[in-house]
Amino acid sequence: MQKIKSLMTRQGLKSPPESLNDLGAFESLRVPGKEEFRELREQPSDPQAEQELINSIEQVYFSADPFDIVKYELEKLPPVLNLQELEEYRDKLKQQQAAVSKKVADLILEKQPAYVKELERVTSLQTGLQLAAVICTNSRRHLNIAKEGFTQASLGLLANQRKRQLLIGLLKSLRTIKTLQRTDVRLSEMLEEEDYPGAIQLCLECQKAASTFKHYSCISELNSKLQDTLEQIEEQLDVALSKICKNFDVNHYTKVQQAYRLLGKTQTAMDQLHMHFTQAIHNTVFQVVLGYVELCAGNTDTKFQKLQYKDLCTHVTPDSYIPCLADLCKALWEVMLSYYRTMEWHEKHDSEETAAASEGSNVMSTEETNFDRGYVKKKLEHGLTRIWQDVQLKVKTYLLGTDLSIFKYDDFIFVLDIVSRLMQVGEEFCGSKSEVLQESIRKQSINYFKNHHRIRLDELRMFLENETWELCPVKSNFSILQLHEFKFLEQSRSPSVSPSKQPSATSSKPVTLFEQYCSGGNPFEIQADHKDEETEDVLASNGYESDEQEKSAYQDYDSDSDVPEELKRDYVDEQTGDVPVKSVSRETLKSRKKSDYSLNKVNAPILTNTTLNVIRLVGKYMQMMNILKPIAFDVIHFMSQLFDYYLYAIYTFFGRNDSLESTGLGLSSSRLRTTLNRIQESLIDLEGSADPTATLTAAEERKEKVPSPHLNQLVILTSGDTLYGLAERVVATESLVFLAEQFEFLQPHLDAVMPAVKKPFLQQFYSQTVSTASELRKPIYWIVAGKAIDYEQMLLLMTNVKWDVKEIMSQHNVYVDALLKEFEQFNKRLNEVSKRVRIPLPVSNILWEHCIRLANRTIVEGYANVKKCSNEGRALMQLDFQQFLMKLEKLTDIRPIPDKEFVEIYIKAYYLTENDMERWIKEHREYSTKQLTNLVNVCLGSHINKKARQKLLAAIDDIDRPKR
């Protein structure tokens, strides 16, 4: 029944997974015979009905556990038996038995073909095995016959042949041993010729051959000798490798690398090479410094050789410091150049080997070579930083071994130049920013520069106090680029000047120092200073250069050596400095020079010797900043102090006048006042002597300040004949404006080196200080304008005029002629001054503007002093003023006349009604309380009554109250 159940399960029957047991209890459940199978299959059937019958069989009949079926069925009987129900149940069991029997019969018949086929396969396998046994038996029999007939007869022949082969091999071995005994002579010759690869190749081959014959007693001694020779070769190879560090030779290094590759020690060679480079750096710097120390000591004392490098550096004298530093950098350059060329060699050979490997070779060998190549590459790249770090530390030790504060400025600049060049080498060598060198030289530079700047400020104060403000005669085409201190700007234009031109300028890769000096030379060779060979052609024979001299210079085309090269071309881009390709003909240039003669003469720069010294000082500061960019902010800060102090001195000498601010004319802008206050607080030491009770912090702050300068006693500013020192005022003020223009010109260069975080300081300096230079013109020239014309005399003349006339006058008053005469005299004296010093048009305009404005305000003040005035008197005022304007316009080209409306509006206000005048008073606050009050009082009785007068005076008082 278990098999029946399993067959039913494989057929996908849903009957419970249990088997029928103990079928003997029911005869009706016996397995049908073949006849019954046939009958069952012949009976018509409904598969679905049969499946339902099978599914209706109780679970217990499929159970694998044995149980009593009869007992089970009897226990199921009800207490009261019903025959009909029993028969129905019995029929049901019979139907279930028939369905199961039929299903079993179907399954058996279905599997019968497979059973027959498998039985046939087993029978065929049995037949094949029997045939194989027969073949094996026959084979064994034939093998025994062959063994007895052939093997024993051939053994003698084989033994003789073997003996022959052994003897031949012995003969070859003896010959090889003989050759090996003679190789030591050849090895010595190859070592003397420095043919290391050949020697190693021969030695390795001998060792390989010797290992083959190690069973011979005579070989052991030879093998030991070859091993000693190989070790000797390695020692000589290491010495040869060390020579690479100072003088790289391609052929020599190629032999050494081939030798190490034959030894299989490529990685070891690279480790040794870096040790040699480190040792070479130490030995090189020590020997260079030791040589200078012993030379300066003047004796052969050996105590210096026992000193540490750090202690040895402290014995270098100031005189030999720069040559020693240059030689030190030159020697270190040779070491770094050798390393650079070593890397070049490996890059070249790696590419060649890669190309050869791509053509096909041993895969294992290629992988090993690639591994070695990768190791060497990483080692070399890592070594760049290590070697540069060693170089930095050695140079840093040397730099800190001597106090640089005692050096002259040019010597210190030279030291910075060498260190800057060394940092450039470091950047090209390994991309390093040389933080160690930068920090060491930055601290020394700032300390040096602070002391240097303090001395320069004191010198500037001395120059200013001794300056007589005479014109320094420079040529009309003067440019600061013609000064030696600014030559470096022409050699290396700032990249920020022309950002749009950068791609084209850098389209070709710049040549590095290693590429430039790879074949020879040294970037640290001390070059002679060529400044003395060049002469600055900036000074003229006098302030203007005589007309004959200049005209002849312009007429003679060949005598244009003083004209900058840029001016000879078509045009120069002011932003980029680039010159177009288009050329200019000789005729065009000649005509242009003639036409520009007067223009150049008019535009000749106005500056003093002190101005020129400040400009030169700025150039020197920029040289230091250009060489050592990390201190750019400090240098620019000190440069700004030079300008601040110059500006403050000009203001103190010529523009300080408390009465100016009381005029309320806004002569000094709030920006200018803020700038002057800032300079006074941060830079000017207002205390005459040091206060012993001052704190240490205050003393340090005062140390950074400079006393306020005093005007030279030779400069007379009180003489009316010279227009109260107008010539000196013009030279001083316009020299400041010129200095500001030069700072504007230098702004792109300063901006290019200024750190990004500090650029707001530079922008603030230019917007709040440099740009205010021209604003000093107003207060300085106002003092001249206030004294050049006798305004008090005009007021006295106006008080003598009778303004309450009853008829309209046709003749103007005398004070107008007196005032015009004063202006004519002023114009005459102005022309006299212009013969000494060129007065620029903006200065002339400011002077005339100040004088006219003061005159007009004096006229209004005179009208405000009038006690009584009629309508005809007001008409006379208008007549006087119109006459004054008409004559004044012939003396000056200023249009419109300053404060013209200020007078006219005041005169016309006399005719206003009460309401209009009240509104007019509130709208015109530019008039003083006295002037407004007088206007109301004069109008009393004519068209304003007392009540209206009180109202208007109250309005004036309301306006004046906030001013108190």
UniProtKB/Swiss-Prot annotation:
Family: Belongs to the syndetin family.
Protein name: Syndetin
Lineage of producing organism: Eukaryota, Metazoa, Chordata, Craniata, Vertebrata
Tissue and organ distribution: Expressed in the brain (at protein level).
Pfam families linked to this entry: Syndetin_C, Vps54_N
Residues recorded with modification N-acetylmethionine: 1
Record-level Gene Ontology MF annotations: SNARE binding
GO biological process assignments: endocytic recycling; protein transport
